[in-house]
């Protein structure tokens, strides 16, 4: 066979194998016996080995996995992968329905989908070809796991139509595959996976794609992040469109005309969840109309047009052996039950929350009791009851201490609170927990500074507050356990990079009581510098939208502390950014002009700008960039092949600019 014949045969084999794979893995209707599929795959592999220059990125052979990667790159999601609000009972669902109808009117229909217990991923296609696959990460930044996702047979390497589209889905491991994997691990003397979700996530985060390829993973596609050239009206239509493109879409998704239909759907699958060949932990309820999605919008964390109904958590019995006390970064002392290990909802549980002293007293919890453990929301185990009839008389009463278990300061209960607090600002536990919060993903996001490293730094007295992180030296870090030269260099680089973080990240990282990520962003925008915020009065803070009396009082009290002034001075001297770097109100009013207060949509291919660069320019000049066109859109910037967004803008009379007009406007604004 010459090269020309080989090229022709390879095309035939790829088409055949793609079609057979689609029918087997997506439609569950095999066209040929496994032996025939294997024969064709072996022929493909042999031809590609003979003619390596004819191997393509979308060949079915990539399902087998390529060479290991040195690490996973961080990638930004163009459209954030937000989490969903939760509903735990019928009343929560009815409250969600009321909020939706109040916002968009009485005529609302929903789509119910099973909530798969796996790993959320984003798949990006350009002209129908898979170019990137990423984990959800924190919703804004994920990890590039493209090579591993290529090994999942249910993920099309090339779509049935050449769309440029971002698709969201859930990668999961079927129950049967999970059981086979754990049997193999047990025989090999290796630690077994706790549940299919952990197995799926662990498989896709292997640096060697060949490992992921052997794990028999699958994927259900459930939404579209972005698409060019296609306009669908409802969420259910988008699911059907994904099916047309070749994705595996769950057959149990259903349109529900009323909230009563939604409740019936959740009850049905709550009872029948164990009949499925894969794990689910609830039902996702979405408003069907995409126009209503636009009207409802988003909170800081989640869309208002969707909610996740969580199934009632499993409850099991075990013995409470001891109660451990933990001091958090705000000084709250939390009791935690230490239990005989027990399997709850697929996870081995050894510890469970007891919340506070009042709950211990109310439930009459004693050491040695047989207790009921429940996984609230299938995430956090908690003790919900005691079986007093199982007592033997050997159980021991538990009393909360009067002193902090870490620094031995007297514990106090503040007015209106049930929690006991340590009010000593120099309490080692509070400082340690504050450091962990400061470096966390939503705060300063310093890679390589986990709890174990921070505990070592604290133990060796290398740090006493968050500012000391910026004074760490290479030789000091090399003395720590499991800190080699590469790890130390990476850590120091991450610490250095964090100096350029936004003011809102720093504010959130400081751990001011009642100031969450959203409030930190508001404060940074309103006051623009740390110095102005330090000087802000209670009245000035209260005048800011979303800042209530409790938060205003907490902020004023925080900045009045002498140790806080010292800390901020140390941070500033270390070079940590103390200034708001986003679009400033004064700049928007005086300079931005053209984008001030405007909602802008970018569509099509831009030749002079990347999409990210254009978005940053618009935001720096006072505008807001969104991903879809609606009546709230003020301006559409259309590049080449703009597609449906430009047509929609034209149909509703929204101003449209060419890339040249956009570039001129930016240049004039910057003169």
Curated annotation (Swiss-Prot):
Keyword set includes Lipid biosynthesis: no
Reaction equations catalysed: NAD(+) + (deoxyribonucleotide)n-3'-hydroxyl + 5'-phospho-(deoxyribonucleotide)m = (deoxyribonucleotide)n+m + AMP + beta-nicotinamide D-nucleotide
Top-level enzyme category: ligase
Needed cofactors: Mg(2+); Mn(2+)
Active site as annotated: 115 (n6-amp-lysine intermediate)
Residues in BRCT domain copies: 590-671
Binding residues for NAD(+): 34-38, 83-84, 113, 136, 170, 286, 310
Cellular component terms (Gene Ontology): cytosol
A Pfam family of this chain: DNA_ligase_ZBD
Single Gene Ontology BP annotation: DNA replication
Gene Ontology terms for molecular function: DNA binding; DNA ligase (NAD+) activity; metal ion binding
Family classification: Belongs to the NAD-dependent DNA ligase family. LigA subfamily.
Protein name (record): DNA ligase
Species, as recorded: Shouchella clausii (strain KSM-K16) (Alkalihalobacillus clausii)
Gene designation per UniProt: ligA
């Amino acid at each position: 066979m010459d090269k020309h014949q080989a090229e022709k045969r390879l095309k035939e084999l790829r088409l055949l194998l793609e079609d057979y794979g689609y029918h087997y893995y997506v439609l569950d209707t095999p066209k040929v016996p496994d032996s025939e599929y294997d024969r064709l795959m072996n022929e493909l592999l042999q031809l590609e080995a003979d003619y390596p220059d004819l191997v393509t990125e979308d060949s079915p052979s990539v399902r087998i996995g390529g060479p290991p990667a040195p690490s996973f790159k961080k990638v930004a999601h163009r459209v954030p992968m937000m989490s969903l609000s939760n509903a735990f009972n019928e009343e929560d669902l009815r409250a969600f329905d009321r909020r939706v109808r109040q916002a968009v009117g009485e005529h609302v229909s929903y789509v119910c989908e099973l909530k798969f217990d796996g790993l959320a991923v984003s798949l990006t296609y350009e002209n129908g070809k898979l170019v990137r696959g990423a984990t959800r990460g924190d919703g804004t930044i994920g990890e590039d796991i493209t090579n591993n996702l290529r090994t999942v047979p249910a993920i099309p390497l090339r779509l049935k139509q050449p769309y440029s589209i971002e698709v969201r889905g859930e990668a999961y491991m079927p129950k049967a595959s999970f059981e086979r994997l754990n049997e193999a691990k047990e025989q090999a003397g290796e630690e077994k996976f706790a549940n299919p979700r952990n197995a799926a996530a662990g498989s896709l985060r292997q640096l060697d794609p060949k490992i992921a390829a052997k794990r028999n993973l699958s994927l259900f596609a459930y939404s579209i992040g972005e698409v060019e050239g296609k306009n669908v009206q409802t969420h259910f239509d988008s699911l059907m469109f994904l099916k047309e493109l070749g994705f595996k879409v769950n057959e149990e998704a259903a349109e529900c005309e009323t909230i009563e239909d939604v409740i019936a759907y959740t009850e049905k699958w709550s009872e029948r969840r164990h009949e499925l060949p894969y794990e689910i932990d609830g039902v996702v309820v979405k408003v069907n109309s995409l126009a209503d999605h636009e009207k409802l919008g988003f909170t800081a964390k989640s869309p208002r047009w969707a909610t996740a109904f969580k199934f009632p958590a499993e409850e099991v019995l075990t013995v409470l052996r001891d109660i451990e006390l933990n001091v958090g970064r705000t000084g709250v002392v939390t009791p935690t039950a230490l239990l005989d290990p027990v399997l709850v909802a697929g996870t081995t549980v050894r510890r469970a929350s007891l919340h506070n002293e009042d709950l211990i007293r109310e439930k009459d919890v004693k050491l040695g009791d047989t207790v009921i453990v429940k996984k609230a929301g299938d995430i956090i185990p908690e003790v919900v009851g005691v079986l007093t009839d199982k007592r033997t008389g050997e159980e021991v009463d538990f009393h909360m201490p009067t002193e902090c278990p870490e620094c031995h300061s007297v514990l106090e209960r503040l007015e209106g609170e049930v929690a006991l607090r340590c009010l000593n600002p120099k309490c080692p536990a509070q400082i340690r927990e504050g450091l962990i919060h400061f470096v966390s993903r939503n705060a300063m996001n310093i890679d390589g500074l986990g709890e174990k490293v921070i505990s070592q730094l604290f133990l060796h007295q290398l740090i006493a507050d968050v500012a000391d992180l910026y004074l760490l030296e290479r030789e000091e870090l090399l003395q720590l356990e499991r800190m080699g030269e590469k790890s130390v260099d990476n850590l120091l680089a991450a610490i250095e990079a964090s100096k350029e973080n936004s003011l809102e990240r720093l504010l959130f990282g400081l751990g001011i009581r009642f100031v969450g990520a959203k409030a930190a962003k508001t404060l940074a925008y309103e006051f623009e510098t740390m110095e102005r915020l330090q000087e802000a009065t209670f009245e000035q803070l209260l005048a800011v939208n979303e800042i209530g009396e409790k938060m205003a009082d907490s902020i004023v009290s925080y900045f009045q502390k002498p140790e806080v002034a010292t800390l901020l001075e140390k941070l500033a001297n270390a070079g940590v950014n103390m200034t708001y770097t986003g679009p400033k109100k004064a700049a928007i009013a005086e300079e931005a002009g053209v984008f001030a207060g405007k909602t802008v949509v970018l569509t099509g291919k831009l030749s002079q700008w990347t999409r990210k660069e254009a978005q940053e320019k618009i935001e720096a000049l006072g505008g807001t960039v969104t991903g879809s066109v609606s009546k709230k859109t003020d301006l559409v910037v259309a590049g080449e092949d703009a597609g449906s967004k430009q047509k929609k803008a034209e149909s509703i009379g929204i101003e449209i600019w060419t890339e040249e007009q956009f570039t001129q406007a930016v240049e004039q604004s910057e003169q």
